[in-house]
Amino acid sequence: MQLTELIETTVTGLGYELVDLERTGRGMLCIYIDQPAGISLEDCEKVTRQLQHVLTVENIDYERLEVSSPGLDRPLKKLADFERFAGSEVSVTLKKPLDGRKTYRGILHAPNGETIGLEFEGKKGEAAMLDFTLADIDKARLIPQVDFRSRK
């Protein structure tokens, strides 16, 4: 079983989603998990303990294991991510430029089959629509929406 498959099986078995996995040159393994209700420190501890056990049993070499939430600027990688975050503001970087640009920022529309829509501000300030597929994307991330106004 490949490392990604092993980790994804473990994480999903605990009721979480594997968002991303990074392996650094210094032996550090970074795992990013999520669930609809968000991720707590206890969730990270639970996944860390289980992964330490699984990686030891499977004899996977690593120096350090880090499990965390994907953060406010969560990457979008799967079609399910684009469905879940429809209506959110996102930044999408395409592999190949379209109309002379690769990076777009706008409001995500729910996928229609394999096609994903992004409503963005066009050259003349009018609303424009970009249609793309997962294969067209280099990277896509949520744009954090933080409200610093205090509640009264």
UniProtKB/Swiss-Prot annotation:
It comes from Burkholderia lata (strain ATCC 17760 / DSM 23089 / LMG 22485 / NCIMB 9086 / R18194 / 383). GO terms for biological process: ribosomal small subunit assembly; translation. This is Ribosome maturation factor RimP. It holds the Pfam family RimP_N. The keyword Cytoplasm applies. The keyword Cytoplasm applies. It is found in: Cytoplasm. Belongs to the RimP family. Keywords: Cytoplasm, Ribosome biogenesis. GO terms for cellular component: cytosol. Required for maturation of 30S ribosomal subunits.
